């Protein structure tokens, strides 16, 4: 077996942990879309999201591989129209996040402040089977497994925005309006 390379290095290796699955027997396209929905989520929210996907309470938006995907009302929260509930992909991603969480505990990181910094799904080598057709023909029956990698990073609490009373907003005017005022001599 060759050395495992991640497609990206963590920003701070002391405050992050990694997990990886290779040659997983789960559809690449479904897993890719589910992983893209998880990108940037806190770990606890991502786990809850995947559990909700398994129960059909939340949906995975299909943005890239959306050919032939039906429309669903739940996708409105993602500002798109097409989505599905890929249960097997959710199971595999939950297992991978659980593995990354245990790696974080072993490393001594605060599990409640972990955020998915990087998640990537890549195509693995296809597995070939055969299906028998009419008139003695044989067609390929291929599977599309994938490699999944995830990097979790520990993030501090986000600083809240200042209220509107603290700093008055500066009104920006368009360039066209400024030119018009300059031509009139109002500027």
UniProtKB/Swiss-Prot annotation:
Q: Which Gene3D superfamilies match?
A: Ribosomal protein L22/L17
Q: Name one GO molecular function term.
A: structural constituent of ribosome
Compositional bias, Basic residues, is annotated for 172-187
Feature: compositional bias, Basic and acidic residues: 159-171
Superkingdom, according to UniProt?
Eukaryota
Gene Ontology biological-process entries: cytoplasmic translation
Question: Which segments carry the region annotation Disordered?
Answer: 159-187
Classification via SUPFAM superfamilies: Ribosomal protein L22 (SSF54843)
Any one annotated GO CC term? cytosolic large ribosomal subunit
Q: Which UniProt keywords apply?
A: Ribonucleoprotein, Ribosomal protein
Keyword GTP-binding in the entry? The reply is no
Family under the similarity heading: Belongs to the universal ribosomal protein uL22 family.
What HAMAP family does the database record attribute to this sequence?
Answer: Ribosomal_uL22_A (MF_01331_A)
Q: Which PANTHER family match?
A: 60S RIBOSOMAL PROTEIN L17
What NCBIfam families does this protein's entry cite?
A: PRK04223.1, uL22_arch_euk
Name used for this protein in its record: Large ribosomal subunit protein uL22
Q: Which organism is it from?
A: Caenorhabditis elegans
């Amino acid at each position: 077996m060759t050395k495992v390379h991640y497609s990206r290095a963590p920003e701070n290796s002391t405050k992050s942990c990694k997990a990886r699955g290779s040659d997983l027997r789960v559809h690449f396209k479904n897993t890719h879309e589910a992983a893209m929905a998880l990108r940037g989520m806190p770990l606890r929210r991502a786990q809850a999201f995947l559990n909700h996907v398994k129960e059909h309470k939340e949906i995975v938006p299909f943005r890239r591989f959306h050919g032939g995907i039906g429309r669903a009302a739940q996708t409105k929260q993602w500002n798109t129209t097409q989505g599905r509930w890929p249960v097997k992909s959710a199971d595999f991603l939950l297992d991978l996040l659980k593995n990354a969480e245990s790696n974080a505990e072993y490393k001594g990181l605060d599990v409640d402040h972990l955020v998915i910094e990087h998640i990537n799904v890549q195509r693995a080598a296809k597995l070939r089977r055969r299906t028998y057709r009419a008139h003695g023909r044989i067609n390929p029956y291929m599977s599309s497994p994938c490699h999944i990698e995830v990097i979790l990073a520990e993030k501090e609490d986000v600083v809240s925005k200042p209220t509107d009373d603290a700093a008055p907003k500066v009104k920006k005017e368009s360039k066209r309006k400024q030119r018009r005022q300059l031509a009139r001599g109002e500027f």
